[in-house]
Amino acid sequence: MFEINPVNNRIQDLTERTNVLRGYLDYDAKKERLEEVNAELEQPDVWNEPERAQALGKERSSLEAIVDTLDQMTQGLDDVSGLLELAVEADDEETFNEAVAELNTLEEKLAQLEFRRMFSGEYDSADCYLDIQAGSGGTEAQDWASMLLRMYLRWAEARGFKTEVIEESEGEVAGIKSATIKISGEYAYGWLRTETGVHRLVRKSPFDSGGRRHTSFSSAFVYPEVDDDIDIDINPADLRIDVYRASGAGGQHVNRTESAVRITHIPTGIVTQCQNDRSQHKNKDQAMKQMKAKLYELEMQKKNAEKQAMEDTKSDIGWGSQIRSYVLDDSRIKDLRTGVETRNTQAVLDGSLDQFIEASLKAGL
């Protein structure tokens, strides 16, 4: 004989949680907006403005993820209740197990939607840029920066995000001095925003013939791509624009033309650069887009005293602003903010970051 009371309790719990989310996420307004967006996308002239059409498509996906999930929860819980009644009437354990399996699936769906509640920031749904900067320490720090770059690229690709390397400056011997990547996809910035900070590596250096332990630092800085219609006043006189020859992998045209562009915002010292296109004009446009995004993020941080100022994040690559410690000899990676720790160091370096990211989001960092 199967126990029905615990299952009924779970159904009641999931129903209550679904109703809470329905109110919190403003289901009625989102459903109405989804109908409006669908109507706009059905207009034959919608693709006359490709950027507008793409924005609507992105908005539709975001709305559907909420509206459809809540609809599925309501219908699914009704279906499970019906299956449960059938199982009791027929004393059929197979039908009971089917109801429990369906309930497990619904619980997982709801948990994912509840997790998305944490993406409530203005730009959490935006695409984002990730800057990686090697700290002092020469080759060892530069190798660590390249390991971080690989880790984030692996994480993003595993989660289905699109990645693009905007700029990469190679180290003298190995690794990289710096890199900027763009990560595109739903809630890219929301997922990655708590990764800003200093990452500390402790290991026996492969570049030390004595095999001694070395401590290296590299920083990650995450900032959202901002909409073109946001007014950010940049005085052209405050900008220094340099062109240079691209370095690194890039085919036969690398180093032949000065197509790479570096822009410096003199009042703040913020630097953006792009070298991933053969066209200097396109690289300049991309670097300006990043500059706009960085200046916007700086303004937001100034308004929020709890966030670190961008200058600190970019300049203090040392003990002060550490977020995570990677001690490879002891097989231990620990997040210094949440206390989350794992001994599976290789999995983390291969992109298994969700446990750290989810804990930091749940902690409200």
From Swiss-Prot:
Keyword Ribosomal protein in annotation: no
Keywords annotated in UniProt: Cytoplasm, Methylation, Protein biosynthesis
Principal localisation: cytoplasm
Subcellular location: Cytoplasm
Post-translation changes: Methylated by PrmC. Methylation increases the termination efficiency of RF2.
N5-methylglutamine, modified sites: Q252
SUPFAM superfamilies (UniProt xref): Release factor (SSF75620)
One example of a Gene Ontology biological process annotation: viral translational frameshifting
Pfam families: PCRF, RF-1
Entry's Gene Ontology molecular function annotations: translation release factor activity, codon specific
Membrane-crossing segments per the record: none
Alphabetized InterPro entries for the sequence: PCRF, Pep_chain_release_fac_I, Pep_chain_release_fac_I_sf, PrfB
Keyword Magnesium: no
Any one cellular-component term (Gene Ontology): cytoplasm
HAMAP family: Rel_fac_2
Other remarks on this protein: The gene for this protein contains a UGA in-frame termination codon after Leu-25; a naturally occurring frameshift enables complete translation of RF-2. This provides a mechanism for the protein to regulate its own production.
Function: Peptide chain release factor 2 directs the termination of translation in response to the peptide chain termination codons UGA and UAA.
NCBIfam families documented for this protein: prfB
Family stated for the protein in its record: Belongs to the prokaryotic/mitochondrial release factor family.
Name of the protein this chain belongs to: Peptide chain release factor 2
Organism of this sequence: Salmonella typhimurium (strain LT2 / SGSC1412 / ATCC 700720)
Source organism phylogeny: Bacteria, Pseudomonadati, Pseudomonadota, Gammaproteobacteria, Enterobacterales
